[in-house]
A protein has these predicted regions:
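Conserved helicase motor core of SF1/SF2 NTP-dependent helicases
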Residues: 279-282, 290, 340, 354-356, ...
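Conserved RecA-like ASCE P-loop NTPase motor core of nucleic-acid helicases/translocases
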Residues: 260, 267, 272-302, 309-312
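Hydrophobic beta-strand scaffold positions of dinucleotide-using enzymes
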Residues: 260, 350-352, 374
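Pre-ATPase regulatory/linker segments immediately N-terminal to the P-loop/RecA-like helicase/translocase core
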Residues: 2-33, 47, 120-249, 299, ...
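Conserved helicase motor
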Residues: 311-319, 352-358
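Conserved motor-coupling elements within RecA-like helicase/translocase cores
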Residues: 320-349
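Accessory interdomain/linker segments of ATP-dependent helicases and helicase-like nucleic-acid enzymes
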Residues: 2-143
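Pre-Walker A (Motif I) flank of P-loop NTPase domains
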Residues: 250-256, 281-282
């Protein structure tokens, strides 16, 4: 697919100029912004530009398939909301139907809503999880649920129980009338889709073109990662000492690969973290593909007594670790300077790669000496390239990367 390259490669700021408008606005504001945006594309090396356009086309196609679906996978894509029948969506676990709301109080704003499952529905077939974004809509009893025939509320799954399910509305309602009006109707829940996750991938690819040439050459495998054989361990990790030393001597990049259940997280991640914390004034980012893996990392940190801040949504984190969320910890800060101090003094940050990708401003406040990425073999390059290319003050925001993954595992 060369359409994107044919469009973007010759594109100039003047070609994007509106026919009407202030000359001063154009010359002093709009033109400089557009030229700064396009410059990394025009100034990139042929290899970097080819890499950029190849993955730009890949992400574009992935976004398209997320909307219209894949012919090889039945019921995929957001278009399944109106293309697939309710029975098909129930069979694939992509719909809750015949849900009845527990009516909230008549007065006051409605931020959460709880709905009961039908008695006959087999919930074990569902592929919904806490933290998933969903749509919620009513439909008349005796008819098939159809999101295109009624109003739709957007929400996030807060909790999934054995008899009921709780949602947090993305746009809280002013009162309960919207639910009491449909009290004789059933309600259905289906998966939602946000484009913001793809926006972060596009932003990350552009960050790759803006990265220092030395980091670009490393990511494109144009040079060997640097190693410092003079570095020695400060801690003792028993049988892990040999591997821990090799990881420490790697200056920029290390791959830790092994079969499932071999202790890559329990020993590899934890001991690498503990060794890095023995160095003064170092800061570490711990990432994984799924929130479940991040919960596991948080459990290891809690067991070791290591303080950390977690990036992400409270609904995606296990209840035991929500008190460590950045959004929770800042509630104790009375001033903006206290928030900055909290971020600067906390040495360990934890979150999914998606959460870190969604917070590019964090790297302007916080630079990391080490990033350890668990479940790395489940990730595709566009999920990582923005993180590995992030810069602050002209230098990589992450100095060293350790990727941990299962042997011969395909991306999720």
């Amino acid at each position: 697919r060369g359409e994107l390259r044919e469009t973007l490669e010759p594109l100039t700021a003047d070609a994007l100029r509106a026919r009407s408008g202030s000359e001063k606005l154009w010359e002093q504001y709009q033109r400089p912004q557009l030229e700064a945006l396009l410059h990394p594309i025009h100034a990139a090396t042929p290899l970097a530009r080819a890499y950029y356009f190849r993955f730009l086309s890949f992400v574009e196609l992935e976004q398209l398939l997320a909307k219209i679906g894949n012919a090889a996978k039945e019921g995929s894509g957001f278009a399944a909301k109106w293309q697939a029948s309710a029975e098909e969506k129930m069979q694939t676990g992509d719909m809750y139907a015949e849900m009845t709301p527990i009516l909230p109080a008549a007065e006051g704003p409605i931020e959460t809503i709880t709905l009961r499952y039908p008695a006959h529905e087999a919930q074990e077939l569902s592929n919904f999880r806490p933290g998933d974004i969903v749509i919620l809509y009513p439909y008349p009893k005796g008819q098939e649920p159809n999101a295109t025939r009624t109003m739709v509320l957007r929400a996030t799954i807060a909790e999934i129980g054995t008899a009921q399910l709780s949602l947090t509305l993305r746009n809280p309602q002013g009162d309960a009338r919207i639910f009491t009006y449909y009290k004789e109707a059933y309600w259905a829940i289906e998966h939602d889709l946000f484009d913001s996750s793809f926006t972060a991938l596009y932003r990350g690819l552009h960050a790759f073109l803006s990265a220092p040439a030395d980091r670009q050459s490393l990511l494109l495998l144009q040079r060997t990662p640097r190693v410092n054989l003079q570095r020695q361990l400060k801690g003792d990790y028993g049988d892990f000492n040999e591997l821990a030393l090799r990881i420490k001597q790697a200056e920029e990049l290390f791959l830790l690969i092994g079969p499932p259940g071999t202790g890559k997280t329990s020993y590899g991640l934890v001991n690498t973290l503990k060794e890095e914390l023995l160095e003064p004034d170092t800061h570490i980012a711990l990432m994984a593909y799924t929130n479940r893996a991040v919960d596991e990392i948080c459990s290891k940190l809690t067991a070791e007594g290591i303080d950390y801040l977690r990036i992400g949504s409270s609904l995606s984190a296990a209840p035991a670790y929500r008190k460590q969320l950045l959004q929770t910890r800042v509630n104790d800060c009375g001033k903006l300077t206290e928030v900055r101090t909290l971020i600067e003094r906390t040495r360990v940050f934890v979150g999914t790669t998606t959460a870190f990708n969604a917070q590019p401003a964090l790297f302007q406040l916080k630079q990391f000496d080490l990033a350890i990425i668990d479940e790395a073999s489940q990730l595709l390059e566009p999920h990582l390239i923005g993180l590995l290319s992030a810069c602050a003050n002209g230098k990589p925001a992450i100095r060293k990367i350790v990727l941990i993954g299962d042997h011969k595992q395909l991306p999720a």
